[in-house]
């Protein structure tokens, strides 16, 4: 059986965007740094990494649609943080952001990762933004790198 699998490698010419929902920026700034660091550690040329800022997680799918429709990017890494509050707002925002990211990624057939945190507390978000549980922004970028290699391996 032939196994087709992406590996963690960049050639250095891949153009990747990170879309950051700025709401909860104390958390999302760390996610962006994690993504940037992972991109550089795996051979990415920082001149080929763009940061697109949007107000919050709900706006990420719109920016993702614009980024992918431009034809400028090989892949897009989405990061943000939605923290549960006392109202159902969390449920609506997290569901729509997740659905929107998946829908747009499939529409354009390009690698897209969802590094949007959905946590019950700010402490959980901090832990996932580089404290105790690693950095989910870095993990989202590593996912993009592997999927981009798989995408290329499968012949686009």
Swiss-Prot record:
GO terms, biological process: riboflavin biosynthetic process
Gene3D superfamilies attached to this UniProt entry: Lumazine/riboflavin synthase (3.40.50.960)
Top-level enzyme category: transferase
Family in the record: Belongs to the DMRL synthase family.
Residues noted as binding 5-amino-6-(D-ribitylamino)uracil in the record, renumbered to the chain: 23, 57-59, 81-83, 114
Keywords recorded for this protein, A-Z: Riboflavin biosynthesis, Transferase
Substrates-to-products reaction catalysed: (2S)-2-hydroxy-3-oxobutyl phosphate + 5-amino-6-(D-ribitylamino)uracil = 6,7-dimethyl-8-(1-D-ribityl)lumazine + phosphate + 2 H2O + H(+)
Cited NCBIfam families: lumazine-synth (TIGR00114)
Name of the molecule in the record: 6,7-dimethyl-8-ribityllumazine synthase
Record-annotated active site: 89 (proton donor)
SUPFAM superfamilies: Lumazine synthase (SSF52121)
Keyword Lyase appears in the UniProt entry: no
EC identifiers of the protein: 2.5.1.78
A family per Pfam: DMRL_synthase
Binding residues annotated for (2S)-2-hydroxy-3-oxobutyl phosphate, in chain numbering: 86-87, 128
Gene Ontology terms, MF aspect: 6,7-dimethyl-8-ribityllumazine synthase activity
GO cellular component terms attached to this protein's record: cytosol; riboflavin synthase complex
Gene: ribH
Pathway: Cofactor biosynthesis; riboflavin biosynthesis; riboflavin from 2-hydroxy-3-oxobutyl phosphate and 5-amino-6-(D-ribitylamino)uracil: step 1/2
InterPro entries: LS, LS/RS, LS/RS_sf
Function: Catalyzes the formation of 6,7-dimethyl-8-ribityllumazine by condensation of 5-amino-6-(D-ribitylamino)uracil with 3,4-dihydroxy-2-butanone 4-phosphate. This is the penultimate step in the biosynthesis of riboflavin.
């Amino acid at each position: 059986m032939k196994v087709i699998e992406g590996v963690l490698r960049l050639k250095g010419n891949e153009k990747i965007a990170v879309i950051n929902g700025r709401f909860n920026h104390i958390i999302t700034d760390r996610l962006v740094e994690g993504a940037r660091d992972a991109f550089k550690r795996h051979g990415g040329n920082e001149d080929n990494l763009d940061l697109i800022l949007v107000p919050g997680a709900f706006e990420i799918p719109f920016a993702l649609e614009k980024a992918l429709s431009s034809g400028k990017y090989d892949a897009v890494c989405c990061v943000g943080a939605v923290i549960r509050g006392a109202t159902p707002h969390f449920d609506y925002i997290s569901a729509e952001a997740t659905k929107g990211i998946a829908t747009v990624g499939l529409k354009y057939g390009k690698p897209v990762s969802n590094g949007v945190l959905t946590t019950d507390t700010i402490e959980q978000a901090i832990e996932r933004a580089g404290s105790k549980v690693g950095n989910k922004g870095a993990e989202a970028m590593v996912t993009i790198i592997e999927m981009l290699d798989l995408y290329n391996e499968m012949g686009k």
